[in-house]
């Protein structure tokens, strides 16, 4: 077990650049971008100096609203070098969500790209901040956002009231190496360096405050569990704005000197092409991404023989999908990670050398230097091994707290430092965990507790089912009933009654879904988490069920 790293993100990148100056750090094959670690650290230093000259101070909150572009990576490490707090913004946000985040985060700066999937970011920003039209770059005075002074635009034109990205390079020349060093030397490993907003699968997002120490060590432990080395080349199709991208992807690579090959926007063909062209050895993804890749009609046309490992995480990982990834994609050492943003994010992970069964059927065991226990929900009383309860964790990875929300922080972390995840789990005698559901997802039908994950795993075995999500909906007689939202495999068909008949005699009668709905897509957050509360709302509306029944 490696020792904990007592450093800052900026220093970590420097150390890696010193150790592997000529190795690939960042590669965008479609944009003809290829930085070695020495070049990448130089770019991040330049960006850091530019941000300093733009007036970004230590502790200032810098929001970035962009997809997986190279500038995002430069900002991640530049803000870390100058002690600013990186606030990540979901690429799918519209005006309402951006307004909430800018207010709640007290952002001093906002960096935007031009557009994402048809949404013009400058149009949204100008609608929220009319003062930009008369403002000088770096001198915004907004009634709505009193902290916000600086906007930076990444695009091919200049916009009123905003710096252009190229200005970071120009202004960097007016800041000396000594000034940057002085700033870096003033930083502490326990400074908050990142605010990730929870994905909003249940309500208003909360700003999770993470430190250098939190994320560096989580990333290094993740890399250790995967047996990641400087020889590896990681394809990163998961979004940078989520911990999956910027910690399990970016920081894990930097911790060992591996190459990062990001995909700007997820598309299964782009991922398959990237893996083949860049001979990637590592591929990350949420289950829906792997499903899309495996079921693409041209899947067999791509050479994926270099793939060795990766992480499947972000939502429950169906065992059938894991088996297909191992057998058809050749990812023999793939691992499953489980966690949440509040834990930097990984809590448990399978190891590359774990048995096939453990890597397919569990979410692994606690990361090094962390503790995990399963407790009776609503208490701190630990349950016996093999019994279900709420998963709690303690260690270096637990967040500093929710920004401006002490009440929510107190509810999440007790006085002994245990983080209560809200996830139901079972731990075996060897410490391996299985996530069995969310406390909030559990439904009670006629006094019987039903866990959606159990029904989902069963329905995955049906030959026509590609994906399935089960939610609880109100029922006048039983209190709640199960509703299954099904995605079918191409060319396959099955009726709701046939699916119910398939369940009879194989799972308990009270677990058989009362409602079966077929769909092509699930409502998702941009980080790939399925928004079950929206499926519940849709079911209630479709079947005219009363939410108060």
UniProtKB/Swiss-Prot annotation:
EC class (word): ligase
NCBIfam families attached to this UniProt entry: PRK12583.1 (NF009233)
Residues reported in the UniProt entry to bind ATP: 198-206, 423, 438, 529
Gene Ontology BP terms: fatty acid metabolic process
Family named by the database record: Belongs to the ATP-dependent AMP-binding enzyme family.
Signal peptide as annotated in the record: none
Keyword terms of this UniProt record: ATP-binding, Ligase, Nucleotide-binding
Protein name as catalogued: Putative acyl-CoA synthetase YngI
InterPro entries per record: AMP-bd_C, AMP-bd_C_sf, AMP-binding_CS, AMP-dep_synth/lig_dom
This enzyme's EC code(s): 6.2.1.-
Stored PROSITE patterns: AMP_BINDING (PS00455)
Gene field: yngI
Domain of life of the native organism: Bacteria
GO molecular function, one term: medium-chain fatty acid-CoA ligase activity
Entry keyword Nucleotide-binding: yes
């Amino acid at each position: 077990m490696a020792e904990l790293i007592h450093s800052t993100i900026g220093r970590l990148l420097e150390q890696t650049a010193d150790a592997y100056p000529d190795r690939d750090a960042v590669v965008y094959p479609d944009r003809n971008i290829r930085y070695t670690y020495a070049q990448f650290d130089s770019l991040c230093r330049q960006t850091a100096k530019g941000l300093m000259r733009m007036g970004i101070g230590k502790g200032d909150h810098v929001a970035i609203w962009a997809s997986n572009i190279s500038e995002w990576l430069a900002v991640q490490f530049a803000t870390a070098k100058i002690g600013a707090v990186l606030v990540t913004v979901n690429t799918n946000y519209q005006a309402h969500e951006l307004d909430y985040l800018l207010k709640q985060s007290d952002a001093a700066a906002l960096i935007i790209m031009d557009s994402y999937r048809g949404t013009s970011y400058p149009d949204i920003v100008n609608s929220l901040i009319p003062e930009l039209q008369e403002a000088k770059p770096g001198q915004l005075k907004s009634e709505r956002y009193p902290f916000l002074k600086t906007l930076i635009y990444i695009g091919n034109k200049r916009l009123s009231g905003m710096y252009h990205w190229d200005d970071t390079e120009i202004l960097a020349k007016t800041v000396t190496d000594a000034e940057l060093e002085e700033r870096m030397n003033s930083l502490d490993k326990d400074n908050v360096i990142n605010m990730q907003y929870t994905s909003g699968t249940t309500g208003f997002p909360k700003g999770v405050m993470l430190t250098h120490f939190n994320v560096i060590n989580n990333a290094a432990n993740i890399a250790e569990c995967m047996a990641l080395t400087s020889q590896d080349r990681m394809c990163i199709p998961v979004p940078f704005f989520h911990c999956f991208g910027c910690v399990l992807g970016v920081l894990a690579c930097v911790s060992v000197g591996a190459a990062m090959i990001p995909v700007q926007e997820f598309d299964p063909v782009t991922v398959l092409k990237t893996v083949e062209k860049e001979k990637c050895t590592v591929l990350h993804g949420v289950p829906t991404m792997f499903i899309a890749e495996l079921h693409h009609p041209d899947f067999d046309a791509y050479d994926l023989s270099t793939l060795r490992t990766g992480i499947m995480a972000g939502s429950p990982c169906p065992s059938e999908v894991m088996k297909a990834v191992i057998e058809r994609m050749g990812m023999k050492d793939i691992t499953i990670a489980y966690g949440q943003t509040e834990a930097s994010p990984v809590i448990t992970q399978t190891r590359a050398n774990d048995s096939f069964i453990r890597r397919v059927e569990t979410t692994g065991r606690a990361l090094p230097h962390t503790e995990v226990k399963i407790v009776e929900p609503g208490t701190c009383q630990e349950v016996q091994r093999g019994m279900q309860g709420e998963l709690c964790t303690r260690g270096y990875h637990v967040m500093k707290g929710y920004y401006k929300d002490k009440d929510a922080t107190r509810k999440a972390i007790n006085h002994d430092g245990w983080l209560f995840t809200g996830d139901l789990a079972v731990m075996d005698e060897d410490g391996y965990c299985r996530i069995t559901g969310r406390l909030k997802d559990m439904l009670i039908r006629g006094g019987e507790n039903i866990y959606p994950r159990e029904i989902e795993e069963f329905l995955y075995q049906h030959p026509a089912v590609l994906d399935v999500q089960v939610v609880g909906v109100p029922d006048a007689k039983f209190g709640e009933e199960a509703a299954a939202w099904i995605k079918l495999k191409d060319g396959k068909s099955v009726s709701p009654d046939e699916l119910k008949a398939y369940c009879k005699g194989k799972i308990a009668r009270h677990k058989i879904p009362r409602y079966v709905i077929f769909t092509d897509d699930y409502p998702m957050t941009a980080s790939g988490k399925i928004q079950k509360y929206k499926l519940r709302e849709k079911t209630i509306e479709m079947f005219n069920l009363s939410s108060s029944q």
